[in-house]
Amino acid sequence: MNHFAVILAAGKGTRMKSKLYKVLHPVAGKPMVQHVVDQLTTLGVTRQVVIVGHGAESVKEVLGTSVEYALQSEQLGTGHAVQMAEPVLGQEKGSTLVVCGDTPLLTSETLQSLLQHHAETGAKVTVLTAHADDATGYGRIVRGEDGNVSKIVEHKDANAEELLIKEINTGTYVFDNEMLFEALKQVKNDNVQGEYYLPDVIEIAKADGETIAAYAASTFEETIGVNDRVALAQAETSMRKRTNEHWMRQGVTFIDPASTYIGPDVVIGSDTVLYPGTQLLGNTTIGSECIIGPNSDIRNSEVADQAVVRQSVVTDSKIGPAAQVGPFAHLRQQAVLGANTRIGNFVEVKKSTFGEGSKSAHLSYVGDATIGTNVNLGCGSITVNYDGTNKFQTVIEDDAFIGCNVNLIAPVTVGKNALVAAGSTVTDDVPENGLAIARERQTTKPDYR
């Protein structure tokens, strides 16, 4: 059977008190609505339609062409929002998930179980429910003797007995697609808010004698919608806890899980140790037996097995096996370190490649450079790559030795096994096995004072 999805993302989110569209607020470094789309994609949903409102262009910029869109120009209720998807999905046959774009904690496993329960019961509608310790404000699920849903009662309409029910409506549903759009045509807005409510479809299906099923999520926490900054912080904490526990079960050591932040797309090898203050975000891969942290920030980067990154910032870069980075180093914009390299304190590397065994241990800037194998860059050595208009390349070949406080004025090449004396400013190429000295001879005046 084909599965489709409608993602409700048109709400203004006024309680967030933000210029940023509500569903674009990040949880674990990723917009909330992107979490929802990713889980549905993992599930194999055939088509996803995102209902957008006044922030449509911002949502499209984030999600791109991976989904389809329908515009709800006026917010006239959840039923009206889903109806906006009819031009896209109205003729399809199958099951349609309706999910809110502000539910970043929902997992593909729960949604899969919901779809499976829907199929097994033969229901036309299946509601995702949860058991809440405090159900205040939520619609209550009233089940019949057969275990199916008898009705959903809003909190304000519930009697004393119904208020004791802890099973609540989460706002996530599966509908038979054809029934959904036919029933939406019958939904009225004769209520206090003057809106078209999606749960009214359940009443219509029930009146037609259809089965209304319910499937309970394993935790209430997974189903929460984020409507303000308090809930956003709660979702962040829950996501971090879930992610960290997953990696701990995969053999990764967290010295202090509460202060370690791992993004949802990060991959970590076994026997790696993460120290406090570590952030791993974006499409980052960490190998096995690595040491990361304390206080390291790594984004969209690859770290190979047995590498060490301490108190450093790494962005869009690659670190080779058994390489050592830090403390207080900065790798960015396609920095690539080979095996057994060393980048030490207060060294910045940008758009540069270090061959195996090469090192820059202290106080250096290496930009737009190609460094061979077993090269030593002395303390304070700088690749001078920018003339105010253009960037230029520096090449340092295998086994070269660059002394302290050397300026390499690009474009320039230092040949294999060459030596550049400390304090030199090099403007011309240095040949293989050559020695370059580019500094004033010392003048000493005895008895000057």
From Swiss-Prot:
Write out the function statement from the record.
Answer: Catalyzes the last two sequential reactions in the de novo biosynthetic pathway for UDP-N-acetylglucosamine (UDP-GlcNAc). The C-terminal domain catalyzes the transfer of acetyl group from acetyl coenzyme A to glucosamine-1-phosphate (GlcN-1-P) to produce N-acetylglucosamine-1-phosphate (GlcNAc-1-P), which is converted into UDP-GlcNAc by the transfer of uridine 5-monophosphate (from uridine 5-triphosphate), a reaction catalyzed by the N-terminal domain.
The annotation note on the cofactor reads: Binds 1 Mg(2+) ion per subunit.
Q: Which keywords appear in this protein's UniProt record, sorted alphabetically?
A: Acyltransferase, Cell shape, Cell wall biogenesis/degradation, Cytoplasm, Magnesium, Metal-binding, Multifunctional enzyme, Nucleotidyltransferase, Peptidoglycan synthesis, Repeat, Transferase
- Main location as per UniProt: cytoplasm
Q: For the region Linker, what residue ranges are annotated? A: 230-250
Which residues does the annotation say bind UDP-N-acetyl-alpha-D-glucosamine? 8-11, 22, 72, 77-78, 139, 154, 169, 227, 332, 350, 365, 376
| Catalytic activity field | alpha-D-glucosamine 1-phosphate + acetyl-CoA = N-acetyl-alpha-D-glucosamine 1-phosphate + CoA + H(+); N-acetyl-alpha-D-glucosamine 1-phosphate + UTP + H(+) = UDP-N-acetyl-alpha-D-glucosamine + diphosphate
Query: Which ranges does the record mark as transmembrane?
Result: none
Instruction: Name what cofactor the protein needs.
Output: Mg(2+)
Family (UniProt): In the N-terminal section; belongs to the N-acetylglucosamine-1-phosphate uridyltransferase family.
**Which residues of the sequence carry a binding annotation for Mg(2+)?**
102, 227
- Identify the domain of life: Bacteria
The active site consists of 362 (proton acceptor)
Q: How does it assemble?
A: Homotrimer.
An example Gene Ontology CC term for this record? cytoplasm
GO MF annotation list: glucosamine-1-phosphate N-acetyltransferase activity; magnesium ion binding; UDP-N-acetylglucosamine diphosphorylase activity
Q: What's an example Gene Ontology biological process for this entry?
A: peptidoglycan biosynthetic process
Q: Where in the cell is it found?
A: Cytoplasm
Q: What is this protein called?
A: Bifunctional protein GlmU
Detail which positions bind acetyl-CoA: 385-386, 422, 439
List the Pfam families: Hexapep, NTP_transferase
Give the gene name: glmU
Top EC class of this enzyme = transferase
